[in-house]
Amino acid sequence: MSDPKRLHPIAVLLNIIKSIKELVIPFLLVVVIPGKNEGIPGWIQPLVIAIIILLIIGNAFLQWLRFTYRIEEGEFRIESGVFVRKKRYIKFDRIHSMDISEGIIQRVFSLVKLNIETAGGSQADAVLSAISKSDADRINAYISEEKNAYNPFDRDKDEVADNEITAKSSSVFKQTLPQLFAMAATSGAVGVFLSGAVAFISQFDEMIPFKRIFKDYEDFIEMGTFILTLFALVALLAVYVLATLSMVIKYASFTVIKTDEEIVISRGLLEKRRLTIPIHKIQGIRIMENLIRKPLGLATVYIEYAGGSMEDKESLSIMLFPLIRKKHLQKKILEILPVYETDTEMTPIPKRALSRYVFRKFLYLIPIIGALVWFFRPWGYLSFLLVPLAIFWAYMQYRDSGWSIEGNLLLLSSRFFSKQTLIMQRSRIQSITYKKSWFQNRKELATITASIKSGITSRVGMVADVEEKDCLIIKSWYSPKKAVDSQ
């Protein structure tokens, strides 16, 4: 593995696509969208487009030609750069995870993409965009074995190691297709889908004939309220179906496999992805229950771990169970991460804290209602309907707030829109703080906060208006054994 190797030639095409994606909006704004071009010959625009395309293709080829990788002296070494030569040496013991994915183009040529990530990186430290699956598996196995102080010297030993890993691994969770549809339908992806569509369309506002659209819209309004309502419902239903299908495609064939040292998560229909997570890098578990799933006894579970990159938002919090029934949750956690076994029974916050949750909602609500009543009278009076909704929201936040200590585990539960339960090992906690305002002090309440490492940032659990003596119990539980460096 010490001989420099290049990526598969299809990496040239991948580089071209990447460059086009990065330049598409500036290209449309500067070249394609018509503007004031009096006096400029008509052949200039096609010439500019042709030059840009040639530059993109040439740069993509040179990037592929100048990119090499190899394994040497306990390091993964990459050399790249068209004009300025860049050398990146990554020590094996700094590697936190290796993520194998298969895009549509890679799958056509039986290739994969390998991301190698270290702690504290803002992006993947090494990206091999087009290599064979056997090479990716060989790199993964070799680095894992080297990190465990075992050095295979030949192909036979590599195969023995692979067989041993296969024998020790077992599939502990698999999301079924009906469960995936239920997960997608209750995920709230519609809002993300709509916002993405609006953001995309807004980039091309000069190309959209708004005057014609609005003229047609005026004619459309004359068709009546019923037709308008029906049209809006059909449009929302179409967006909902598209958002649901996109989630199902993204998480299709979701499987969790555990070995002695790692958790391997694979998923995807069009783009297959396999993420390998070292168990000793896991910092905590986060359980999320949104407004739809909680009444149904369903939850989504994430792993917080000291890895990932800012470019890949998914790698900061890894989805362990996309959708699982709460009654089966502890059994599955016991199979995968037995150190996080807990009954999740919480100590609730005191009843006198409820008034503070309601009070905080009214601090925001009163100015809003006042403005609506003042500027939109008489329809503004309908804003008073927000009062019972605010009280109900405050009660839900109060009801779902709590804490628990079980051996070396701290559990903090709270709600903004979705209920979050953060399970943390004492040795992984970076800090615990509690503070109290003058108003909290009058009622002997305080706010407790605990943080763990998650990617290059921190994941914070916070519960407001906890009994002050309970905060002191949590602080004293944590103080004797300070959290160790999780890296």
Where are these regions (language model features)?
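N-terminal basic, Ser/Thr-rich segments that initiate or prime the first beta/alpha elements at protein or domain
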Residues: 1-487
